[in-house]
Amino acid sequence: STDQAALYYALKAARRVWCAFVFDRQILDVLPRADRRVEFIRQSAEALDAELAALGNRHDTPGVRLIVRHGSAADEIAALASELHVQAVYANHDDDPYALARDAAVRGALADRGIALHTSKDHVVFERNEILTGSGKPYSVFTPYKAAWLKTLDDFSLKAYPVERYAAALAAPPPGLGHGVPALAALGFVKTNLEALKVHGGSAAAEALLDDFLERIDEYDTARDFPAVKGPSYLGVHLRFGTLSIRRLVRAARDHATARRSSRGASAWLSELIWREFYQQVLHHLPHVVGHSCRPEYDRVRFEHGKHADEAFAAWCQGHTGYPLVDAAMAQINQTGYMHNRLRMVTASFLVKDLGLDWRRGEAYFAEHLIDYELASNNGGWQWAASTGCDAQPWFRIFNPLTQSRRFDPEGRFIRRYLPQLARLGDDLIHAPWQAGPIDLEAAGVVLGRDYPQPIVDHTEARERTLARYSAVRSTQPR
């Protein structure tokens, strides 16, 4: 999207502005060769290239293109800045620990050449120290944070950056510099199933998704919990990679609620966007959450380890736990790179509180597979489910996977979509095939242990083990 802080500030400050994007080898080289995120980013870079060309043409600056590089961010940006003889480089803030280190390296490499680096807030409405308690401390509980966030919100915070007004400063890359977005193969990647999934990069695709969602937003507060229903916005990947600005989304939610005098759906969606900002400020103020419990006492929880734990983790990853809703959810993430939000909570709770496994193992699996992966939200979500987070569910609250299945997929539609081998089981039995009698199983063509696994854990017994595991930590807490 061109509603972008860094682009606006660069255009406003300079006579000539070149736009560049670096495919960072330090990120890409450790990824699997088929990675939906890389394909999405490449599509989005191509769309941005076309958007910039059109913007240039509208302002009598033909030949404006996105300059694309593939290498180390610090090396490529410094080299490009020298080649173009620029005085400053503009970019946006990113509080991911890797991004902070990368930006420091870029700043250093530019400083060696006498070039400034200016970075701006863009990825959130309010960042870092903008929402603090009365005593100047960061919030550790969501509800008061949300109240302060809403109180601080004003029209100015949500304005789109008026890039068009200053677009005449856009410059075409000099001859011989090279531009254009490299093919996926040139980046070392292969095509995924994004096209079949109808997931498209770029701001036009994002706007189309937003338009579609706004037709359904009034039902969001109820529909969002049912994975078989088209309830969510599906905009997470666009928000993650900046093809649609957070300002645009908050404006849409607020305007919709105002137009309807009130909309529980729009309010619930806005609340989710604020949760994202809450987790971003937690990451900024408490960077130890990467790798450690937000509440340090929970680092003492003794999770299962060893061969049996590794086998249980593999079964969870592959969707072979014997709990159909959990397994269908894992099939969804493995096949599409997306998982419904309710199911993110269910699968996380199952891993930690049914299987007794360390939440960091699940966090890493989601980080590798989710197309909309953001460190702060993923970490926050996992620590919420594991009861180790700043404002997590209580440690004694343990999701019952069967209750969740019957409540949120009552007819088994989602389960049937991802576990077709269970499709002929009745609505009452599909949630717990092990409870079906031999006649029902035979009629459905299901042999447990062959077509579908027996449960790898008994929920009632697992619940007792989890209560004991967390109680042990609570009882040794200093008073």
Model-based region annotation:
Residues 41, 203, 319-322:
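Generic alpha-helical segment signature
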